[in-house]
């Protein structure tokens, strides 16, 4: 046990030595893609890929917390994913129950706070209960915020937010002059979080699939070739090193 702890500490130190500690992205968002293809390559059912993907979430959460990432948003289930086979959807809906049952004690120990964005009221009762229990048990934690985007879609979020803004303006007798970027930001599901500096998508696909479409306007995109179950701590560090090698301009010019 002691040897294992020493090895873990050495690994974390090695990762920290590879990175510029002054330029760790505060908020990393990940599109966890490739579970189904991972299983298909191994002639396994798709649900096996989702199970292995859950193990990857644990690894990435640990390392993100250890290196000082403040926010980690994971695209767990989109508003479009309901069209998948019922058996697969049912399995995915049960994953948070199993995941949080086994991982919650460690999340509490590591001071990780569990949060969600998305239309979670539409989820099965058991899923909602597991999520709410994790939120309650970690509510006072002050470390990494682990944010699951579940039953989430960027367009659906914008429609929902626009309706709320319209109702607010109407009820308070305000006109549209009040609307600016800050006003919109304050009505999004992500209002309590900074925009992601880094967006990672695994599996090699190069699209954002309706994920945080407002929030990633100035994010750095990295499309990693690994399927999500194969994505590990080393791959995350590689992505962060690529991010650190770039110069973020926000539409301006770089300094010569």
From Swiss-Prot:
Alphabetized UniProt keyword annotations: Magnesium, Metal-binding, Transferase
Active site (record annotation): 33, 81
Record has Membrane as a keyword: no
Gene Ontology CC entries for this record: cytosol
UniProt name for this protein: Isoprenyl transferase
InterPro entries: UPP_synth-like, UPP_synth-like_CS, UPP_synth-like_sf
Function, in words: Catalyzes the condensation of isopentenyl diphosphate (IPP) with allylic pyrophosphates generating different type of terpenoids.
Binding site for substrate: 34-38, 46, 50, 78-80, 82, 84, 201, 207-209
Source species of the chain: Staphylococcus aureus (strain N315)
Record: residues binding Mg(2+): 33, 220
PROSITE patterns in UniProt: UPP_SYNTHASE
């Amino acid at each position: 046990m002691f040897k294992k702890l020493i090895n873990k500490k050495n690994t974390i130190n090695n990762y920290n030595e590879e990175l510029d500690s002054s330029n760790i992205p505060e908020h990393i968002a990940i599109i966890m893609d490739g579970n189904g293809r991972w299983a298909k390559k191994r002639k396994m059912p798709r649900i096996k890929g989702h199970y292995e993907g859950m193990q990857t979430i644990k690894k990435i959460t640990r390392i993100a917390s250890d290196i000082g990432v403040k926010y980690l948003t994971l695209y767990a289930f989109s508003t479009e994913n309901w069209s998948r086979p019922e058996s697969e959807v049912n399995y995915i809906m049960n994953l948070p129950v199993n995941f949080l049952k086994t991982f919650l004690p460690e999340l509490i120990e590591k001071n990780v706070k569990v949060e969600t964005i998305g239309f979670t009221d539409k989820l099965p009762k058991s899923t909602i209960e597991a999520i709410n229990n994790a939120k309650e048990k970690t509510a006072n934690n002050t470390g990494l915020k682990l944010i699951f985007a579940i039953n989430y879609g960027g367009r659906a979020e914008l429609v929902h937010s626009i309706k709320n803004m319209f109702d607010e303006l109407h009820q308070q007798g305000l006109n549209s002059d009040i609307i600016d970027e800050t006003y919109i930001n304050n009505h999004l599901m992500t209002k309590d979080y900074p925009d992601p500096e880094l967006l990672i998508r695994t599996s090699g696909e190069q699209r954002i699939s309706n994920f945080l479409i407002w929030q990633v306007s100035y994010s750095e995109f990295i499309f990693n070739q690994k399927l999500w179950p194969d994505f590990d701590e080393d791959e995350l560090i590689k992505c962060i090193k690529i991010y650190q090698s770039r110069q973020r301009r926000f539409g301006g010019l770089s300094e010569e």
